[in-house]
């Protein structure tokens, strides 16, 4: 385990690791325990009662946060003809087809999200082994395989985030920056929490949301009582 700095250890003293804090209080504590010298990202981690090894308990989706994440994503769109023009008009950073497939195969990754029209997926599929492990492969479940490229690009630019359960049953999602107003962080939290509740697989048994933790980059984790989310909104 890496050695923690003095500032981190001081911040840790402010947190009761056995307590699940109300959302509003947890957000305030995240700011107090932030030790980064930059505008740190605030992230929420959900530990879910699902078995990701089972196909009927996979959780994946996307949601537009009302106040964004504080980062404007660079969007690559695979499209041709009119759809390519629509993507450019919507604000996509890169639009094209085979030339970008070749660039990616050569190691180019100056983008954060990939969108593709369905007719391009035959070609984009060649990038599965490259984009898949990085979580960048377009997917209908996250709205990134679509003919409505205008909506897709605009939502991503507005603060759409993807969420996906990992092998351990956890979901990690950024909800903003420590510089955000507390109310905005709370509303973003409420939005992603509601989306994850709606995404509960029918096959999931027992307690669905087992644990929720909020943290800032380099800061300590703070347990959250998600049932207080209505109070925080």
UniProtKB/Swiss-Prot annotation:
The keyword Repressor applies. One of its GO terms (molecular function) is tRNA binding. GO terms for cellular component: large ribosomal subunit. Pfam families: Ribosomal_L1. Part of the 50S ribosomal subunit. Belongs to the universal ribosomal protein uL1 family. Binds directly to 23S rRNA. The L1 stalk is quite mobile in the ribosome, and is involved in E site tRNA release. Protein L1 is also a translational repressor protein, it controls the translation of the L11 operon by binding to its mRNA. This is Large ribosomal subunit protein uL1.
């Amino acid at each position: 385990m890496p050695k923690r700095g003095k500032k981190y250890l001081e911040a840790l003293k402010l947190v009761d690791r056995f307590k699940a804090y109300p959302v509003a209080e947890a957000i305030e504590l995240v700011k107090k325990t932030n030790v980064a010298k930059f505008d740190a990202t605030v992230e929420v981690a959900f530990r879910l009662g699902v078995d990701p090894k089972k196909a009927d308990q996979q959780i994946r989706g996307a949601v537009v946060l009302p106040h964004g994440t504080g980062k404007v994503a660079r969007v690559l769109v695979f499209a041709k003809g009119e759809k390519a023009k629509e993507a450019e008009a919507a604000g996509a950073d890169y639009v094209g087809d085979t030339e970008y497939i070749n660039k990616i195969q050569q190691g180019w990754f100056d983008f954060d999200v990939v969108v593709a029209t369905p007719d391009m997926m035959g070609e984009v599929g060649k990038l599965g082994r490259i984009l898949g492990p990085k979580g960048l492969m377009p997917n209908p479940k996250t709205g990134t395989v679509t003919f409505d490229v205008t909506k897709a690009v605009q939502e991503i630019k507005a603060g759409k985030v993807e969420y996906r359960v990992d092998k351990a049953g956890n979901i990690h999602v950024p909800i903003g920056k420590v510089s955000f107003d507390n109310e905005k962080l709370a509303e973003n939290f409420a939005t992603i929490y509601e989306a994850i509740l709606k995404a509960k697989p029918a096959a999931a048994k027992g307690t669905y949301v087992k644990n929720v933790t909020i943290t800032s980059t380099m800061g300590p984790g703070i347990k959250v009582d998600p049932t207080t989310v209505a109070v925080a909104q």
